[in-house]
Amino acid sequence: MYPAITPLQAGLQWWAVAGRQGVAELWQVQVETAADGADGEVEETLYWYLSELGLPHVERQILAGRLVLRGYLSGETPEGVMERWREHIRERLTQKAEIGWYAVERRDWQAAWREQWRPIFVGERLVIWPVWLPDPPGDRLVIPLDPGMAFGTGEHATTRLCLRALESVPDLGTFADVGCGSGVLTVAALKLGAGRGWAVDTDDLAVVSTRKNLEISGLEERVTVARGSTEQLSGPLDGVVSNILAEVIANLAPEFRRLVHPGGWGIFSGLLLTQAPRVVEALAGQGFALSETLSEGDWACLVGRFSADRPRSAGS
């Protein structure tokens, strides 16, 4: 029996997996564990193992007190690899988890998810508008988007939180988008008044998608797009937005401090509410002053500014 997934969910995964590898079959990988015992560390461990397996995106749900994480792989994944991967996770988790994989029914997911995807209205001023739909509204700033195979369609809470946060910054100026995905945050920042941007991502497909969406909006001359991370960027900038993983944000905190001038803004998401204190601590050690925590469901977005004070060294 095939698992129940929406055309939008499967369509995005088809683009990210089958579209990339030239296959038309998908396997759904599912990890399930007790929600009341799954603290931020356990959940982040599961995300890490799923990403190591090669899942480009992971869906998260709480169903009847159970934490359920799902992702999709091409149908060419050997069963033996999956068996070894399952045992590897079970040996390292501190609580019991059910791990399985299932064949997903073959169909034209690309057409199906286009039929299902609708405009996404965010905050007070923005709307993400699929490029294949006619007549965008005239009362909002339109972000025309063709997501391709990259993350960031507005379907995920962290993308929406970052967009709301960008709306709240009075003078965006120059900025960097670290982990740009589809480029939706880069386009939004420019539409909201930013002057010039730099967008980086370690995924080649994200770089291609960001460039394409900038061209759709006629903004390609105002953004430098590169494959990589903060090593591709130079400061000082007026601000930085980064919607990636909690651990990565914490590790990059010194780099964000290097890039943003004193008084500059920072918007950080891709983290759970339970992970926020740890990330705030890492950023605060680099002079970041938290002004607001936005939330949607279990997801958080940190908004604040970098102070003029240099971070303290150990023992000072």
Curated annotation (Swiss-Prot):
Catalytic reaction annotation: L-lysyl-[protein] + 3 S-adenosyl-L-methionine = N(6),N(6),N(6)-trimethyl-L-lysyl-[protein] + 3 S-adenosyl-L-homocysteine + 3 H(+)
Purpose of the protein: Methylates ribosomal protein L11.
Keyword hit for Glycosyltransferase: no
EC number(s) on file: 2.1.1.-
Binding site residues for S-adenosyl-L-methionine: 159, 179, 201, 243
Record-linked InterPro entries: Ribosomal_L11_MeTrfase_PrmA, Ribosomal_PrmA_MeTrfase, SAM-dependent_MTases_sf
Top-level taxon in the UniProt lineage: Bacteria
One GO process term, biological-process aspect: methylation
SUPFAM superfamilies in alphabetical order: S-adenosyl-L-methionine-dependent methyltransferases
Pfam families, sorted: PrmA (PF06325)
Main subcellular location: cytoplasm
Location relative to the cell: Cytoplasm
Name of the protein in its database record: Ribosomal protein L11 methyltransferase
Keyword Transferase appears in the UniProt entry: yes
